[in-house]
């Protein structure tokens, strides 16, 4: 352990008195849980907001036959940057789960408190819902025009609640006639398992190939790679993103926006798949005898990171 002195932000600069007082209140154990939940909510908000914004351009561009509004490449990058921003901005306050799969993995493999996990998951779903509402508001004029166009073309019933319809900006659906539910399940399960392994690799403090500063990019690019390769056959990867956005779609278009049996796959299958990915990493890649010096961290910080 390094003998370098521990320097706090308050040692380097003074904050306004109102912020200093608020910090004391915020860091109190009775209040801090709300700060953690806000961080989880806002982290999910960030990547869903950027991801749905690019998805809106893609869907609307296809409906109005306007090319170059967006692309699968752009959507993948939007989600990747959103995840990167979320980790960089919010993880120091909450630990940076931003995904019910990750939270449940911490419960199972790290002893994360169950009540705290429930709070996190609710906050994560809320973040996706708020992001969806904001994207809908910002794209509302074009969404309404596209909806009216589908009605006039008598294509509303066949297109609206598909990946090619305005509701598909928010809720995830299968491409009609192009993907079966079993294949969608396979697609979701395999990719969620891989994502789980990659996240756990980034969190492994002894994994010298992925130092802490590279972790956010490592995880973000994993999501981008899956979107680039498997978004078209349908992939969700995140219960909060799927359920929060789907609930919003149902708030606008009613129960039809809930989708078919695929909705349960998109919402739930990533959970056991991620747990399997973490289990595989723990079995085949984690090594308790593998050491690594952590000179910039003290015991209190380590406890916060791994709890």
From Swiss-Prot:
Family membership: Belongs to the MIP/aquaporin (TC 1.A.8) family.
Domain of life: Eukaryota
TM segment ranges: 41-61, 69-89, 121-141, 158-178, 184-203, 217-237, 265-285
Its biological purpose: Water channel required to facilitate the transport of water across membranes. In addition to water, also shows strong ammonium transport activity. Also enables low but statistically significant glycerol and urea permeability. May be involved in fungal nitrogen (ammonium) support of the plant host in symbiosis.
Topology Extracellular: residue spans: 62-68, 142-157, 204-216, 286-307
UniProt key word Repeat: yes
Stretch forming the signal peptide: none
Reaction(s) catalysed by this chain's protein: H2O(in) = H2O(out); NH4(+)(in) = NH4(+)(out); urea(in) = urea(out); glycerol(in) = glycerol(out)
Motif segment (NPA 1): 99-101
Protein's membrane topology: Multi-pass membrane protein
Keywords: Membrane, Repeat, Transmembrane, Transmembrane helix, Transport
Domain notes: Aquaporins contain two tandem repeats each containing three membrane-spanning domains and a pore-forming loop with the signature motif Asn-Pro-Ala (NPA). Lacbi1:387054 has NPC/NTA motifs which is in accordance with the fungal aquaporins (NPx and NxA).
Induction and repression of expression: Expression is reduced fourfold during ectomycorrhiza formation. Expression is highest at 15 degrees Celsius and decreases at any other temperature.
Subcellular location: Membrane
UniProt-listed InterPro entries: Aquaporin-like, MIP, MIP/Aquaporin
Full protein name: Aquaporin Lacbi1:387054
One Gene Ontology cellular component annotation held by this UniProt entry: plasma membrane
Any Pfam family hit: MIP
């Amino acid at each position: 352990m390094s003998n370098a002195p521990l320097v706090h932000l308050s040692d380097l600069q003074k904050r306004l008195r109102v912020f200093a007082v608020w910090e004391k209140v915020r860091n109190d154990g009775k209040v801090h849980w709300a700060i953690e939940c806000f961080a989880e909510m806002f982290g999910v908000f960030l990547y869903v907001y950027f991801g749905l914004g690019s998805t809106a351009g893609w869907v609307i561009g296809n409906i109005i036959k306007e090319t170059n509004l967006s692309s699968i490449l752009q959507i993948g990058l939007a989600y990747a940057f959103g995840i990167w921003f979320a980790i960089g901005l919010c993880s120091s306050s909450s630990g940076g789960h931003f995904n019910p799969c990750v939270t449940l993995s911490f419960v199972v493999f790290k002893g994360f408190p169950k009540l705290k996990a429930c709070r996190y998951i609710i906050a994560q779903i809320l973040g996706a819902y708020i992001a969806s509402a904001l994207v809908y508001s910002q794209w509302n004029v074009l969404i309404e025009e596209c909806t009216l166009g589908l009605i006039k073309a008598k294509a509303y019933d066949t297109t609206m609640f598909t990946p090619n319809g305005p509701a598909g900006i928010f809720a995830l659906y299968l491409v009609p006639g192009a993907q079966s539910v079993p294949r969608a399940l396979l697609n979701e399960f395999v990719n969620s398992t891989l994502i789980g392994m990659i996240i756990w690799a980034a969190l492994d403090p002894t994994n010298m190939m992925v130092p802490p500063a590279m972790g956010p990019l490592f995880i973000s690019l994993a999501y981008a790679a899956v979107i680039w390769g498997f978004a078209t056959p349908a992939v969700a990867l995140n219960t909060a993103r799927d359920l929060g956005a789907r609930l919003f779609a149902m708030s606008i278009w009613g129960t039809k926006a809930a989708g078919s049996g695929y909705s349960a796959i998109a919402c739930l299958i990533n959970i056991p798949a991620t747990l399997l990915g973490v289990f595989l990493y723990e079995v085949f890649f984690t090594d308790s005898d593998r050491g690594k010096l952590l000179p910039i961290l003290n015991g209190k910080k380590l406890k916060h990171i791994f709890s």
